[in-house]
């Protein structure tokens, strides 16, 4: 019987009409492009630590992880940049250690009424003061304003005109909470009331980083394409980079084939970020460099970066992320921002870059931390996030096509004379399918040079295993327009004695 049926048996003799459906030629792959935010939760949250959970709103994030928690703040930044795509949270309990603490000292009392535009972790906290307020009253007003906003990542208490601000969560990450005032300055209508002076000691003393053994284990085989992992200590990064690595047990290994990429952020001066880049070398990880002067915590920068990357790469994994805005993130003031030469150096050092050219920071180059091959020589194979993002799309397309069209097929040599309709393939048939898939990918702007691909594509039966097909798949990934260089060789007038050979 030439036609290969899957359900209707060959010995069926009952009349009359029997039909089975075969979707192998109809379907196309659909991928959710799931994001995962990893962060510390508070004890007041209802979520189970180390267990991933889908989140659909900021209200859910607050309830699950605790208002003012690190992870709740990350969701706030994510939703400000991407409210359309699927996102999960992976809460971890506070590490053993201490919470960061800082102070706001009311040095002199106001002589006129006004509003203090206080900023805590980049969040505006307006505090009204009267002309007759003493330093103690002002300090108490600051505490009341802070305690009234549950979304803030700190608590506050005042003694003798000094407000002590303490992070709600323990860990080294709590050191990144910034306290300032009048961020937008007089041009933005923000200045301290006349006579009032405040002195800040930024939060410090936060210690400890979470352990991720259980959290990573509980992810199981769930596919997550865009992971926001804001912890940049070497132990945390190694744990996640191992999970998403190329090894046999990694998500990019041939056994699991889950793929996925990691996004993070790190604050520091230029030399510190360059030094940090020297310690990392992972194709799957992209760390965004942030200036010291930004009042927004790095864990929210990381969430914003992840959100914009997820939204853009899901639409087109080969398109560059440059100029995508990182909404809700407050950049450092202009005199604290990286120079263009420093940004260029960071890009070469394996640090993703952002720049503020108007009022909102935008992604400049989505570099990964991969800069060297196994011998320690410089290598740009995995320099950009778009490379693995594009390969993810190509390999999933290919896997969907092969597993849908040839799920239970026989394998024969090229030239075998088998009947039409048989569930049988040859190397030439498989090669034709791969070429057809490549043409679709080329039409969709993921690859180029289809003729060269067909020439270099190899599909053959394994000489030692007659049931196995080996494929050398050589895609030419489409590139991005990242540099437009112009030599403006001007004239004051053509045919001025220098260009006499130019025709009129």
How would you describe each model-predicted region?
Residues 97-110:
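Disulfide-bonded cysteine-rich modules in secreted/extracellular proteins
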Residues 36-38, 79-83, 144, 219-416, ...:
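A glycine- and small-residue-enriched flexible loop/hinge signal that marks low-structured segments
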Residues 110-112, 116-119, 184-210, 219:
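Bacterial flagellar/type III secretion structural subunits and associated motility module proteins
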Residues 119, 173-189, 242, 487-490:
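Extended Gly/Ser/Thr-rich low-complexity repeat segments
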Residues 106-108, 131-133, 158, 206-214, ...:
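Surface-exposed ligand/attachment interfaces on beta-rich extracellular proteins
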Residues 136-143, 212-216, 237, 241, ...:
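Extracytoplasmic/secreted envelope proteins and their assembly/folding machinery
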Residues 57-65, 108-178, 227:
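Extended, beta-strand-rich, solvent-exposed assembly scaffolds of outer structural proteins
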Residues 1-88, 323-328, 342-504:
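Structured, hydrophobic secondary-structure cores that serve as assembly/anchoring elements
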